[in-house]
Amino acid sequence: MDTKPKTTTTVKVPPGPMGYVYGRACPAEGLELLSLLSARSGDADVAVAPLIVGLTVESGFEANVAAVVGSGTTGLGGTAVSLKLMPSHYSPSVYVFHGGRHLAPSTQAPNLTRLCERARRHFGFSDYAPRPCDLKHETTGDALCERLGLDPDRALLYLVITEGFREAVCISNTFLHLGGMDKVTIGDAEVHRIPVYPLQMFMPDFSRVIADPFNCNHRSIGENFNYPLPFFNRPLARLLFEAVVGPAAVALRARNVDAVARAAAHLAFDENHEGAALPADITFTAFEASQGKPQRGARDAGNKGPAGGFEQRLASVMAGDAALALESIVSMAVFDEPPPDITTWPLLEGQETPAARAGAVGAYLARAAGLVGAMVFSTNSALHLTEVDDAGPADPKDHSKPSFYRFFLVPGTHVAANPQLDREGHVVPGYEGRPTAPLVGGTQEFAGEHLAMLCGFSPALLAKMLFYLERCDGGVIVGRQEMDVFRYVADSGQTDVPCNLCTFETRHACAHTTLMRLRARHPKFASAARGAIGVFGTMNSAYSDCDVLGNYAAFSALKRADGSENTRTIMQETYRAATERVMAELEALQYVDQAVPTALGRLETIIGNREALHTVVNNIKQLVDREVEQLMRNLIEGRNFKFRDGLAEANHAMSLSLDPYTCGPCPLLQLLARRSNLAVYQDLALSQCHGVFAGQSVEGRNFRNQFQPVLRRRVMDLFNNGFLSAKTLTVALSEGAAICAPSLTAGQTAPAESSFEGDVARVTLGFPKELRVKSRVLFAGASANASEAAKARVASLQSAYQKPDKRVDILLGPLGFLLKQFHAVIFPNGKPPGSNQPNPQWFWTALQRNQLPARLLSREDIETIAFIKRFSLDYGAINFINLAPNNVSELAMYYMANQILRYCDHSTYFINTLTAVIAGSRRPPSVQAAAAWAPQGGAGLEAGARALMDSLDAHPGAWTSMFASCNLLRPVMAARPMVVLGLSISKYYGMAGNDRVFQAGNWASLLGGKNACPLLIFDRTRKFVLACPRAGFVCAASSLGGGAHEHSLCEQLRGIIAEGGAAVASSVFVATVKSLGPRTQQLQIEDWLALLEDEYLSEEMMEFTTRALERGHGEWSTDAALEVAHEAEALVSQLGAAGEVFNFGDFGDADDHAASFGGLAAAAAGAAGVARKRAFHGDDPFGEGPPEKKDLTLDML
């Protein structure tokens, strides 16, 4: 396997401090906007906000910096001092530690701090505990305001800090350079800045964490140096402890959170450290291994303590240590993406008032709620994968034989309260007698404590998590019974509520109530088998290979080795360019809008009669046929491209960026990205553990320290081997930049000196920049040398991919969406007897069942039927895509892909297809959906919620999430979206004798079905990705270039549609009414589109709902709704007087044209088939040409 060689680029960064404390008067404008984007709990004066130019930092803010992190002695006598500089980038979050109360809370949920403290104790994680000497020397927010000349009651103080040194501030290893204060302008406001520097500046050659920072007599302090007062602010230190260190501690299974902070800080200061960073006394969670078997270690299952599993525990801590080291490397990286600038956000264009701007931001954040819900409720989400299991040796007879898949991550949220074990497997004192929940089959309810743990026990992040969950659908769209919040609150006035967090007046907004409303979607951990990881990431490139055939005939495959052609010539002959030409021509014909691929363009004005339909379909067919023929001619004759092999190797592919500024402008979204990255890092590290253990005495006390560097190097060697692409940079200081820093002798209130010399500690940076995700286009069988288990798995998949040998309903075929949309124009008389409303379901069902009276069909009708049937049969014969087109864009792309598959002799199996579930937002569809935001609770809850619904414009955050699906991913990916998808990382060696480990990031599934997202369906031939677009919202738009199968309303309705019949619409409506009852009236056109993926039927459903409400005189009545549906069914079931019927079954067959319809029908059918290509024959295209002709030509096919 060839990989791109590592390229080294020189990047110049300015020297500077490792952070700033910003102080400003509370802004009059933009406060509502900042509140929406921030994470804040109502019971705390602190918050986490995003770093945004124009909102929290000034214009021109440099994201990358060579931060001063220490000093070193130089010169012959070691008397001179130079500064040590470390490249890094600023954290995408800023930390508000004074004045946070001026920001509106993210949720009205009460007592979140109490919930986090309770959860922390319950799961055994350490609490924040400042030392007495820290408290004695605290720098309070009031004191800083006084120095800056700000009113403490109206001031806002927040920390802007580099990514790698947040923990250093948390453990008081920094100081404020008060003499270096300056002023900047944010918006129209003047803002003070105080630089933050490390205490290590005053300790030359000391590259470690200072354990006692307030000891001014430390022996490492340089002679005559004026040691400053360390910066300790209790609210800030606690905020960093909870929001920064807490999530990492949960992900790495480290109960001693303070030790994680010190380990991360040490890795930041000491670039040469390679040994263990996490403490030796780390504890482990006790649980039964997967499949109900006892825990096991390779050689010591029965003799290393009562629980066994020694190697499992060792792999757990070493993989966590390696992941922490890898995260530290990424935190020191220099990235290209600038920080977000609110003045350039497209979503704010034209929004003149602060309320309108806040409303636009609120609507966008509600989009992201769908992705947050998927990460919380998917059972294989990175948020839940917090424990390590052991599958045992690959070869039971040879325990030393390494396996990449022996150790793996499993969901641990529900077992986090189990007893803790020490290194030897003994229960830690204090945990005796605790019950042990099983890894599989437990009965634990997902509760507020679990949600707090997912957020690292940070009340601020928990508040923002609830902000998103309050905007998630509880299951109504898939037919689940959603809790009546009003009734629940009213009934709870007489009963006890187990949360102990709320009162009757605040119960509607309580975290417990929100989780109760979403109870039907709670994750259910029914399996602990090794599988995919549900990750949150960001697509930051407008380029992706997500067309129907992926990267088939891509630039890299067509480029000649001699480099004799220019890039443009090669690109014009790729499959990608051919699809772009087809879409451009369709757009020129006004059939499609490339920016909105699901739109019908101007077809409503173009298709005014049946002749126009013929023209549209023929134009699409001829256009695609022409492009495919030209493409294949260029590939075969011009480039001698191995077109069949190219198809077998084709992949759908995209890349997820690790650049922190590509994530959404919200602290919680940044948390999801961080937890996803940590899960990926640990997965890679765990794959190397067994190889490190093989042949070693793992029981030795010094094993971890000795072999942690070995594991770390193995993980670093995985870069650029197919999955984790890395970048190598040479870092240099900006030209002419002076190194300004505090004087080492004059004190921290003295002005900065610019006479320092400095050296960059990490001149050459190698760090991962993106994750590559791919999915094979073709279903691949097991290779000849695959294991028996692998062959069995492939055999079980074959039936899912096997193309059935049945004729497809015309309305479910390639032209179904046009026939339903334009039925009244194409067949104006195609309506049931006694009805004035043309009905496509009735018409085509009767026609295909040979029940349609022939007298109802005109000569023109017969010609059109012949045309439609012939095209549908031709398409069906070559179709290997398990999806029916829903619009012209999909029809053209599917037809094009099928034509290429025909040239390549593809047969038997469906190909893999991609579907994007696009997150959207809307105002609350019902009063119930707005209950959590009601200004008053208790007895006045319903009235308060109705008042809010009556004045939605005054509530910019009152939006809820929704979804729509799209099967053409390239325009979706061009919007550079935030995504959630399943990721399975396979590892394998290269050629024989090569010990290089390659990986592949395989596009997999989210587990949890409709719990994760209501539009996910169980279909092995489809890969899903949840997407929230960024381009056009928070960044500039670019030009276009397996859980268990769950029976849901969505699948029930699509099953009714698939069965067909004249009464499809009424059957769908009846099923929905029986499932949802009065909630049916809440479904908007967007909900119906999401459920049915059929625009015509969705409009029919809205009409049924309107008629049902009219029948009930404005009130919903299930009886009235069913009556309306049954009347519609009776209408379309009438076939009129008996007589000769139209024989659709025989109509259109090649041998029966004349007998069935006479000359006219034969001519119509013949005309419809003129453009058909001859079938592709021959096993060996080379064998069909003349013997003397060596090159393959298209005519041979």
Curated annotation (Swiss-Prot):
Q: Where is the protein found, in the record's own terms?
A: Host nucleus
Q: Where are the zinc fingers (unnamed)?
A: 499-512
Domain of life of the native organism: Viruses
For this chain, the annotated S-S bridges are none
Tell me where it mainly resides.
host cell
GO CC terms in record: host cell nucleus
Q: What is a GO molecular function of this protein?
A: single-stranded DNA binding
Gene3D superfamilies in the cross-refs: 1.10.150.560, Viral ssDNA binding protein, head domain (1.20.190.40)
Q: Does the keyword Zinc-finger apply?
A: yes
Q: Name one GO biological process term.
A: DNA replication
Kindly state which keywords UniProt assigns to this record, in alphabetical order: DNA replication, DNA-binding, Host nucleus, Metal-binding, Zinc, Zinc-finger
| InterPro entries in UniProt | DBP_sf, Viral_ssDBP_head, Viral_ssDNA-bd
Instruction: Give me the ranges of the annotated region Disordered.
Output: 1177-1197
Q: Where is this motif: Required for filament formation?
A: 843-844, 1142-1144
* Ranges where the record places region Required for nuclear localization: 1172-1197
Which HAMAP family does the protein's record reference?
A: HSV_DNBI (MF_04007)
> What family does the entry list?
Belongs to the herpesviridae major DNA-binding protein family.
Please describe what this protein does.
Single-stranded DNA-binding protein required for DNA replication.
Q: Fill in the subunit field for this protein.
A: Homooligomers. Forms double-helical filaments necessary for the formation of replication compartments within the host nucleus. Interacts with the origin-binding protein. Interacts with the helicase primase complex; this interaction stimulates primer synthesis activity of the helicase-primase complex. Interacts with the DNA polymerase. Interacts with the alkaline exonuclease; this interaction increases its nuclease processivity.
What is this protein's record name? Major DNA-binding protein
Instruction: Give the species this sequence originates from.
Output: Human herpesvirus 2
Q: Which taxonomic lineage is given here?
A: Viruses, Duplodnaviria, Heunggongvirae, Peploviricota, Herviviricetes
